[in-house]
Amino acid sequence: MKVVTFGEIMLRLGAPDYLRLNQCNQFDISFAGAEANVAVSLANYGVKAEYITRLPKHPIADKCISELLSYRVDVSRVIRGGKRIGILYLETGSNMRSSCVYYDREDSSFATIGEHEIDWEEVLKEADWFHWTGITPALSESTYKACLRACLLYTS
């Protein structure tokens, strides 16, 4: 079985030690994205998982790709382009204070993906399942068009 996932992965900057964002002088870094998480989980279960996204050409995006590769996720068709990776800021809750997440993803590499940047016919040729979430087409007009194109090809 092979599953293709499509969506945005973001740099997650977390305030350490239950601090609030306005109290910290450094961040814990990791990466987050629903579709990437699904690909990692599937790969951990031994399912062939390919992740499709668009990331800028810089060392932070390289680190992101390395993380996915460490879980045996196929990232061979990740598109490199755009200017920035989307960012989410995390305050982990403590006691009665709940966690808070703040998103900064406007004009990210993924949000500005071109409708025809992905060769969906080739990507989906051997896919048994195509996974995306509702946020993917909601991010921008171009992610909507790219996702719609993939869905139309996958169901035909």
Feature annotation, model-predicted:
Residues 1-73, 113-116:
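Glycine-rich phosphate/adenosyl-contacting loop at the front of the ribokinase-like
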Residues 48-135:
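Conserved N-terminal subdomain of the carbohydrate kinase-like
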Residues 114-115, 141-143:
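A short secondary-structure junction signal
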Residues 144-149:
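Charged helix-capping and loop-helix junction motifs
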Residues 154-155:
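Conserved small/polar residues in nucleotide/adenosyl-binding loops
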